[in-house]
C-alpha cells in the first residue's frame, strides 16, 4: 500500500468556499458534555475548568504544582485543544477540594478558572464524556460564501458528514503513520511505550481515513453512473456485485451507501450488527438510528463481511499478525452534527457557527467539509 498522503474525498459536491478561520480563544470554543450526571456525593471532587492557551496536559501539571498532588490522581475524559477557549471536567481526591478556593488567584494567573465544584463516587476516566459543543467564528466571509456555507450546513444537518481523523496526529511532516508501521514490522521501537502506542494509532488512523475515502468514492460512483457503468466498474475492481444489489444501492437516498456486510452500530452508541438487509439499514441510517463503522485494525477487531469485507481487506494491513499488542476496534464512518446554529454578520464579514458532535469526532472534519480546501492542514480539534 502507498503510504503517501492522498487527498481525502468530501461528501458533498460544492466548490471550495473561501474564508479565514483562526484556531484561537476568541474564535474557537469547546465545551465538554459529561457522560453522566455527578451525584454530589462521593470521594472524588469534580470541577469544571475553563482554560485558554493551555493543553489539557499542561493544565494538569498546573493543578499538580499548585495543589501538591500527583498527576496520576487527576482524572479527565479527553484532551482539549490548546488554541481555544475550552471547558472540561476533571476529578481529584476530595481531600484537595478545600485548596481550590484558596488558590483561585493562582489559577487565574495561569489562565484557569474553576466554574463549578461537585462530587462523585468514581474518578473521571478517558472516554467519560458524551461529546462536545463547539463555537467557531469565520472571518472574511462574503455574502455569497455565507449563503453557500448555509447550504452545506443544511446538507450536513440532514445527512451528516464523514468522520475523518484530523491530520494533526500524523505529525508536522505527515509521517507518524510510517513510523507506526515500522514499529509493527519490528523495524524500530521507542523507549516510551505511550509513544509507540500513539504512532501505531496514527497508522490505524491513516488506514481508516483511506478506507473511508475509498468508500466515499464508491458511493459517488454508485450514485452518479448508470447501472451498466457500475457493473463494469465493479467487474474491473474484481468486486462481486450483481445488478439487483446495485439497484438496491442506487435506491438508497443517503449519499454514503450501506454495503452488504457492513458492520453497523446503533447511533450514537450501542451494539454492533451486520448490514444484511440493505433497504432496512439504509432507512435506519437516514433516520440517524444506526451508522456504518470502519476498521481500526488489530488482533481482536471485528471485521466486515461480504462486499464490505472485499473492500476492507485492502486496509487490513500488517496489524493482525503483528507482534504488537494492538487490539483494534471499529469507528463510525459517519457522524451527525446536532444543534447546528449559524449567524452571518455582513457588516463584519463574519460567520458564527455552533454545533454539537459526539465524542471521538472533530470540528476540523466539519470545517474540512465546508471549505473543500485543497490539501491537508495540521488541525485536529
Model-derived segments and spans:
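Non-catalytic, substrate/partner-engaging modules appended to enzymatic cores
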Residues: 1-381
Amino acid at each position: 500500500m502507498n503510504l503517501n498522503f492522498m487527498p481525502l474525498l468530501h461528501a458533498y459536491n460544492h466548490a471550495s468556499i473561501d474564508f479565514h478561520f483562526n484556531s484561537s480563544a476568541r474564535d474557537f470554543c469547546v465545551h465538554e458534555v459529561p457522560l453522566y450526571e455527578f451525584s454530589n456525593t462521593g470521594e472524588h471532587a469534580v470541577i469544571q475548568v475553563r482554560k485558554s492557551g493551555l493543553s489539557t496536559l499542561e493544565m494538569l501539571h498546573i493543578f499538580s504544582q499548585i495543589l501538591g498532588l500527583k498527576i496520576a490522581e487527576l482524572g479527565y475524559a479527553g484532551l482539549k485543544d490548546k488554541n481555544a477557549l475550552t471547558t472540561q471536567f476533571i476529578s481529584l481526591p476530595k481531600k484537595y477540594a478545600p485548596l481550590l478556593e484558596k488558590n483561585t488567584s493562582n489559577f487565574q494567573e495561569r489562565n484557569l478558572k474553576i466554574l463549578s465544584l461537585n462530587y462523585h463516587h468514581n474518578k473521571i476516566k478517558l472516554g467519560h464524556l458524551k461529546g462536545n459543543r463547539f463555537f467557531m467564528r469565520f472571518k472574511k466571509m462574503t455574502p455569497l460564501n455565507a449563503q453557500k456555507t448555509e447550504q452545506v450546513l443544511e446538507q450536513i444537518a440532514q445527512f451528516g458528514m464523514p468522520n475523518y481523523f484530523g491530520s494533526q496526529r500524523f505529525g508536522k511532516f505527515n509521517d507518524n503513520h510510517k513510523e507506526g508501521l515500522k514499529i509493527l514490522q519490528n523495524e524500530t521501537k521507542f523507549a516510551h511505550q505511550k509513544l509507540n502506542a500513539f504512532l501505531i494509532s496514527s497508522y490505524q488512523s491513516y488506514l481508516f481515513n483511506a478506507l473511508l475515502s475509498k468508500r466515499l468514492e464508491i458511493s459517488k460512483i454508485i450514485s452518479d453512473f448508470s447501472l451498466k457503468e457500475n457493473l463494469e466498474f465493479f467487474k474491473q475492481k474484481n468486486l462481486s456485485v450483481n445488478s439487483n444489489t446495485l439497484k438496491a444501492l442506487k435506491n438508497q437516498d443517503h449519499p454514503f451507501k450501506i454495503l452488504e456486510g457492513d458492520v453497523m452500530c446503533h447511533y450514537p452508541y450501542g451494539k454492533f450488527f451486520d448490514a444484511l438487509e440493505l433497504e432496512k439499514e439504509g432507512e435506519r441510517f437516514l433516520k440517524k438510528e444506526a451508522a456504518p463503522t470502519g476498521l481500526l485494525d488489530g488482533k481482536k477487531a471485528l471485521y466486515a463481511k461480504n462486499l464490505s469485507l472485499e473492500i476492507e481487506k485492502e486496509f487490513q494491513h500488517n496489524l493482525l499478525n503483528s507482534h504488537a499488542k494492538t487490539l483494534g476496534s471499529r469507528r463510525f464512518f459517519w457522524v451527525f452534527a446536532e444543534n447546528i446554529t449559524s449567524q452571518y454578520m455582513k457588516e463584519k464579514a463574519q460567520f458564527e457557527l455552533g454545533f454539537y458532535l459526539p465524542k471521538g469526532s472533530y470540528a476540523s472534519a466539519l470545517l474540512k467539509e465546508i471549505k473543500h480546501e485543497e490539501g491537508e492542514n495540521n488541525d485536529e480539534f
